[in-house]
């Protein structure tokens, strides 16, 4: 099953997350199919904290991908900010 979830990157104490479409059997930070966006919880100033490619996200959802609870919350937050 394909899931859309967060893959952690960044340095110690400086988290950065890629929003990826991946097979559910792969590790959290392991192999993924496609990068759909990113989330930077420590963004400040002019940096963007959340970027999501909504076209690709919709494509994966139409093809049966499940969103993790955190990604679902972030997508809802991004849609609210865009409106």
Curated annotation (Swiss-Prot):
It comes from the Bacteria. GO terms for cellular component: cytoplasm; small ribosomal subunit. The keyword Flavoprotein does not apply. Transmembrane segments: none annotated. InterPro entries: Ribosomal_bS16 (IPR000307), Ribosomal_bS16_CS (IPR020592), Ribosomal_bS16_dom_sf (IPR023803). It holds the Pfam family Ribosomal_S16. One of its GO terms (molecular function) is structural constituent of ribosome. GO terms for biological process: translation. The keyword Ribonucleoprotein applies. Keywords: Ribonucleoprotein, Ribosomal protein. HAMAP family: Ribosomal_bS16. Belongs to the bacterial ribosomal protein bS16 family. This is Small ribosomal subunit protein bS16. It comes from Azoarcus sp. (strain BH72).
């Amino acid at each position: 099953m394909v899931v859309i979830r967060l893959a952690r990157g960044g340095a110690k104490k400086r988290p950065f997350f890629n929003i990826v479409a991946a097979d559910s059997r792969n590790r959290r930070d392991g192999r993924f199919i496609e990068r759909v966006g990113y989330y930077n919880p420590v963004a400040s100033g002019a940096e963007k904290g959340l970027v999501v490619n909504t076209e690709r996200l919709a494509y994966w959802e139409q093809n049966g991908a499940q969103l993790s609870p955190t990604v679902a919350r972030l997508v809802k937050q991004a849609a609210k900010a865009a409106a």
